[in-house]
Amino acid sequence: MVKRKQFRFFKHSKDQKFALFLWGMKKLPETLSNKLSVRLQNNALRQLPKPTDLVDFASNDYLGFSSSATIFENTHQYLVANDQLQNGATGSRLLSGNHSVYQAAEDYIAQFHQAAAALIFNSGYDANVGFFSAVPQKGDLILYDELCHASIRDGIQLSNAKAYKFQHNDLEDIERLLVRHPNTTIYIVTESVFSMDGDTPNLEELVQLAEKHQAFVVVDEAHALGVLGEKGEGLVQSVQLQETVFARIMTFGKGLGCHGAAILGSEELKSYLVNFARSFIYTTGLSPHSVATILTAYNHLEIASEVQQKLKNNIAHFNQEKNRLSLKPLFVRSKSAIQSAILPGNERVKNIANQLQEKGFDVKAILSPTVPEGQERLRFCLHSFNSEKEITEVLQLLSTFVFGH
């Protein structure tokens, strides 16, 4: 029972009554409680972690931009210089929330990515849900990689189009589905870096296949921005396919270290999304500060070649060390900042993650049902600020905990 002294902050009898009401609120329906119990029994119950000072091998902050004092200060200076001192957007962008910094940021993003237009969304989730629920129409077909992110799947579920998943990065399976559906508007959906495996598709051949069947290619670049390409522009530009890919989803909470997302495409696509993407229309926009941070992070990305190279060096060092320590068979093949070691079983992978954390390394276990049963894993996220010594040490510990030597 909660002790009385914990309610001392309530000053009035009305407040006390409200506190007691909250205290006595109805429990969850039994069906929901049972679902939580099943998760607990399966060692799969998700819980919010506490902040730690462990060595970071868990976050998506690949370039360390989230803690960049330069980005922080430059954002503040931009807002002051442009008289953008509001704390919030005040409304949706179609009403009162379309502040001038939005146009500046979208123009810069489009230019950086060599796209005709960019439209900012509040998050990568909102961007994917908005796109896939609005663009593919009844009678259209969506073909999506079986490992596509949950936000893509949720958007597809809201669409009136039919959808089929294809085997991961399997061009033959894509062509089989394309041949079965002639004379149909088809969208082929993939990711430039898959969030759980860290691998990439053969985008050149996929685009060739799409052009052969007049299909539209959509690429989620969430984990590629800041990581792949000469200036961190992503996979599509690195293979010079920006003019043939129909749409790109860029998210800013990873390599750019801030928040939000943008969909890149034609001016006509942007206009369509403004009119029909419900996750864009029916929500308060990002604050001017958030949008200015995006703009400043992009500016910083253009001059961040040193940290980008440091990240690439760390990825190479990680791959060298896992080979040296005979860990390669455990890992999904990846040349990105995401490196996943498959350790089947929720209990097993959680135990090894806990052991690494006790030794000072923040490595997260990815459990089923987030990944299929039998594909549970440790996911190592590499950063420009990790040292080679830290990488070697965490892999040596992994070898000890897995192999016992």
Locations of regions flagged by a protein language model:
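PLP-dependent enzyme catalytic core of the Aspartate aminotransferase-like
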Residues: W23-G24, S67-A69, E73, Q111, ...
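Conserved PLP-anchoring active-site segment centered on the Schiff-base-forming lysine
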Residues: F131-A150
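N-terminal "arm"/small-domain region of PLP-dependent enzymes with the aminotransferase-like
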Residues: K26-N87
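PLP-dependent aminotransferase class I/II
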Residues: G255-K322, P329-F331
